[in-house]
Amino acid sequence: MKAVVLGSGVVGLMSAWYLQKSGYQVTVVDRQARSAEETSFANAGQISYGYSSPWAAPGIPQKALRWLMEEHAPLKIKPSLDPQLLKWATQMLANCQLSRYQVNKARMLAIANHSRECLSQLRQEHDIEYQGRQQGTLQIFRTQKQLIAIEKDIALLEQSGTRYQRMSVDECIKQEPGLAAVSHKLTGGLYLPDDETGDCYLFCQQMTELAQQQGVTFLFNTNVKKVNAQGNQVVSVSTDAGELQADVYVVAMGSYSTALLAQLGITIPVYPVKGYSLTVPITDESQAPVSTVMDETYKVALTRFDDRIRVAGTAELAGFDPAIPEKRKATISMVVNDLFPHSGDFAKAEFWTGFRPMTPDGTPLIGKTPLKNLYTNTGHGTLGWTMACGSGHLLSQIITGEQSENQAGLDLFRYAS
């Protein structure tokens, strides 16, 4: 049995990995020269099982209106009459109801916790070096209102069996000593001990080598021109390297999956939500974060690699605009300077932007399509690195017919109504 996976970001890569473990002869196609050269290249670096939450949440519509007027707001919207964006935004607003938020978050936590198990097993079986740490995430709050609001999430964490610890300001400083000088800016925190960190790009390079050793073929520098269908199934994929034929096909092209599937008359609600990051070399380890610190006010994550800090945040609805405006640089620079001002050489900061493939309800699209041998694994938003291993494993189970309690409600048919 043969499988073709379109896309070699962390989600496509792990789709290929688990398909080959299930006995498939796998070919991966990507337009870049290496794996993870796009959205997976310089993401936040956080593997946030406990922080897996939909952006569509109660109170977000009101917050979004306020953020439009704030200089360092976590959400920016570029005015547009794009019908895809308008439909996507309408669906997102509908998912801000508490009842839908609870369903969506529960699904996301289930995928994330399954992914934790898969990544743990992967580390046990293979010697993978990606500057990974297993020291948790500290979500910090600057207002009493934020402390109170977290209670609704704690109930869902308990329901999913996700460990957590409420922390006072003193406990936050004990967990992250680098915050000591700014303790007066904090009101408390929520610690998620099972969360991890790591350089997604390094992980992908390691996994590409392992996959090649297991027989997976990678066609880099190869553009997908068209997916060809006859009747109710795909018969081939046209690329600039020729035609590819397989028994099953997986679309894992992040935000670019939407346009490709549209050629087949398949509509998916995945829209590019632009994010930004900076990477700064550490000059004083005692002043740097130990693991990941998540600033709830600005929705910015600060993650520790071995000798670097990765700072990532901002959600911008601007289509596929690759520009990095100075205002966006200023926001993420402001947060790291505010919390860890003496940690690194900010003159050497490297900025990056990527397009997160976001669904309106936050849950990815994993599973079947109207064409019987075509599958999707996309729409993970900010949680591709967090959910990649679990998503790849779940997809392989769906394709091979193995049943799992975590499969329900993940495919695109949940948007059919």
Swiss-Prot record:
**Xref: Pfam families:** DAO (PF01266)
* Gene Ontology CC annotation, any one: plasma membrane
Mind listing the GO molecular function terms for this protein? D-amino-acid dehydrogenase activity
Which cofactors does the annotated protein need, by name? FAD
Q: Which BP terms from GO are recorded? A: D-alanine catabolic process
What is this enzyme's catalytic activity, as reactions? a D-alpha-amino acid + A + H2O = a 2-oxocarboxylate + AH2 + NH4(+)
Domain of life, source organism = Bacteria
- Binding positions for FAD per the UniProt entry: 3-17
Q: Which UniProt keywords apply?
A: FAD, Flavoprotein, Oxidoreductase
Q: Which EC number(s) are documented for this chain?
A: 1.4.99.-
Xref: InterPro entries: DadA (IPR023080), FAD-dep_OxRdtase (IPR006076), FAD/NAD-bd_sf (IPR036188)
Free-text function comment from the UniProt entry? Oxidative deamination of D-amino acids.
Concerning its family, UniProt says: Belongs to the DadA oxidoreductase family.
HAMAP family xref list: DadA
The protein's name = D-amino acid dehydrogenase
**Organism field:** Vibrio vulnificus (strain YJ016)
Q: What is the lineage of its organism?
A: Bacteria, Pseudomonadati, Pseudomonadota, Gammaproteobacteria, Vibrionales
